[in-house]
């Protein structure tokens, strides 16, 4: 319904909650990908979930922060469910944004919020705003850390595969393991811009990445930048050849079964899952099956006001307008 959806699909809290019924049916170990949409342009105002008030004079920026807060809350609920359902400790979580958050046309309005001077905002600052969150959470691995390695989404696959103990030497991969000492730390954008830990290259202009100051074109700088450009151009050329020539159709390593796209349709996915479960029989390793048919869905707790049984108290004195769980009315 319109109440439960935003521009591109279900609101995050409802999406995660409704996904639990499918997640518990997946044979373990499984790979599951969730694409959330609440924290996505145009960040529409949602009075039912307005838990973070900001007034910058730009509704898009205000909405960005409010929906980011909402997305955080949705993830917290999902993580709690994973713990309560007994899936958390044996799961590797990978969270990332697929592109920048706010259009560069609004960056000068955003600048004061991140401690920057809008009058001094320039191309380097725009480039830095292309960064996206990337989090790997491995329960039980000890104290976490923040890595200052430079990388892109192309590096996610080799990084995760190595964390899972997969030998990738037989595979063709364009990315690099972000945790490897041999990682070159180069990020190449489709428009030819390049970011490394040392230099940010935007057209013919070169900045020091750590300070944002212009890099003087000394012989050493020119030589290093030329080497970086050569690496970047090679990456883009290979990407173009693979994409434009559809070269993946020739890539069939040992043990790889090409995907038959005709067999995949989101509309009949639940029915196909049911068929797969029936075929497994006693070999089923899903959470639902190993729990002797007891569903974990009731363990999922959400304060989403749209969810049956939850209600928002419309009172200005209620902190942040937080939803309050109430019992469903008797029929």
Regions found by a protein language model. Give the residues of each.
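Solvent-exposed soluble domains appended to multi-pass membrane proteins
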Residues: 1-331
